[in-house]
Amino acid sequence: VNAVEVNAASQSPEVMYFAGCMSHLTPRIIKSVEKVFKAASVDYVFADRDGGICCGRPLMLAGKTSAARETIAANRKMILDSGCKTLVLSCPICYKIFKDEYDLKGIEILHYTQYIKRLVEQGRLKLSACDERIVYHDPCELGRGCGVYEEPRKVLSQVGNLVKAAKEGDESICCGGSLGSL
């Protein structure tokens, strides 16, 4: 995807959605995020709808720093050229890399749980409650890596009975999934 293709969807989108390769491995995440955007009438463009765009982290881990820098520069240009105000990411790894490695000059970078919380608080998204018990696992990169603990819990507590896990927050146990499956 290049900047011209992204801009064709909306001249000045409110949001650019970047799913990331881990979300592409679990397509229901992408479908759910798009369902939320539709329900809240979010004007957005989908940066990596067809896959093929990477945040650069796998390249960094492989020691390919030059390729990682090129990827980051290309992504940065695409995002800045889109005219979006907010970049929403569903992959905690991508979220951390965009926060730490990208200089997006005034573009807000949010994990999708943070954005959903905002949509609910603004009254743009209505949640339906149920009687289900919900246990939330803090992903390493999102929790310990970026300090995002409360937003997911705020949203989940509005849709069900949020149950405290034996180990959560900084004490949460790593699932081992991060980039090990790539």
Report each predicted region and the residues it spans.
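Iron-sulfur cluster-binding electron-transfer modules in prokaryotic oxidoreductases
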Residues: 1-182
